[in-house]
């Protein structure tokens, strides 16, 4: 042992250095904020800040937020956080690798493990005769680890040469002795259900001890079977671990795609520089900003157009009012002149009064005509400073108390078109009379004035429908719910109607009339029989059940038209 000490000078110094290095390693593995040791996962996983410092995940979550950023607790530099917050910060993988090596017994240059590690990753066993040598064989008789040279030297005699020596890989496991009978090795395993004692037993335990009469198995095959199960389990665990790792990598990739980041690229002359790669989150925000930017521009244009309409209306109204002011001033001047002339005539003598009779008569006739004209003008003109404004769905402005809408009512003969029209107009039931030609009536509802054209539905009149399509904003198609056999005919006429170019932007309101009749088709059945979802695809349409006799459902249909045409109610601007 003295020679060994001489062969290793400065061993104490080396051990001191190793101790100081070990302390330094521990310091590196501690979080500088909470002084807890980092872990491979969980709240103590190390994460990198932009300045290069490493802080555990738990401490990062406790740091105060400054908007979407945090400050380093050591140098106060700012690190921006993405949408994932602290979870989006990169892990310190170099530190994690060092932690993993230390946990697995890898010591590197510091010598923290009890055994050295070879290049193949297997433990190196020292020779029992000379620790400077590496053992390569095992003597099963001497129970010693020997290198090849020491094996030859120590077993050079005839007696010892007979000892069985095997490679270390074939070294047999040492037999475990029974705790109850120390002289006997454990050879069997108890398989008895309900046995409360240790399953390991020797031959004495099996024959005479607590396991007497129990089911049993030989130790080695049982251990090999368990090893095989463990290997299968380990294989499953490795497969499961690979699946988890692959899923985790996908999650990391998705997070990076969402958040974006910096990417190193080379320019045309080979110089590398960082370039920001936008993530899907930033792209989505850009799409939202672009959409609302276009929307703002469109609204601004529509606002300017609406203001120009209002300005033109105000300008025309003021011009007309000022013209009326001038006319009234002239009229007032003429009336005042006539009054003065009459007063002067009254002051004159009788002869002059008689001579002025004709002139006074003409003057009075002129005044009467002017008074009559003034009365007619005053009766027809409403002196109101309000400016009623109505907005359509496409943000166009209409100025006036009522917005006029042109509506065409179509359908087969006998469906109840005229009955619906006069019920809306006069709130009266009108006996069904075939319409020859057309009827036109004005129906005021809320802030709308519907000009409704009721066109006859007889077969010979249907070719004339096209003459009423121009400038039509809404089509009311009336269906007789009580005549199931005419639904296909109504479908054919409606299909032709919807192919007309002049009606492609018109609203379509379908009245399922005569819902009060027993056995009438329901709204759902008519919708299916007319194939409305397919026929009216891409068009604004609505079907409303109604009864023209009682008026049930008629105003609900007008409500739908009002909602489709008008974006806001009438605003009285003083």
From Swiss-Prot:
Its main location: cytoplasm. Pfam families: Arf, zf-B_box, zf-RING_UBOX. Residues 390-574 are annotated as: ARF-like. It catalyses: S-ubiquitinyl-[E2 ubiquitin-conjugating enzyme]-L-cysteine + [acceptor protein]-L-lysine = [E2 ubiquitin-conjugating enzyme]-L-cysteine + N(6)-ubiquitinyl-[acceptor protein]-L-lysine. A zinc finger (RING-type) spans 31-76. A zinc finger (B box-type) spans 122-168. Keywords: Coiled coil, Cytoplasm, Golgi apparatus, GTP-binding, Lysosome, Membrane, Metal-binding, Nucleotide-binding, Transferase, Ubl conjugation pathway, Zinc, Zinc-finger. Pathway: Protein modification; protein ubiquitination. It is an enzyme of class 2 (transferase). SMART domains: ARF, BBC, BBOX, RAB, RING, SAR. One of its GO terms (molecular function) is ubiquitin-protein transferase activity. One of its GO terms (cellular component) is Golgi membrane. One of its GO terms (biological process) is positive regulation of autophagy. Its EC number is 2.3.2.27. The keyword DNA repair does not apply. It is found in: Cytoplasm; Endomembrane system; Golgi apparatus membrane; Lysosome membrane. In the C-terminal section; belongs to the small GTPase superfamily. Arf family. Homodimer. Interacts with PSCD1. Interacts with UBE2D2. Interacts with TBK1 (via N-terminal kinase domain) and p62/SQSTM1. The RING-type zinc finger domain is responsible for E3 ubiquitin ligase activity. This is E3 ubiquitin-protein ligase TRIM23. It comes from Mus musculus. The lineage of its organism: Eukaryota, Metazoa, Chordata, Craniata, Vertebrata. The gene is Trim23.
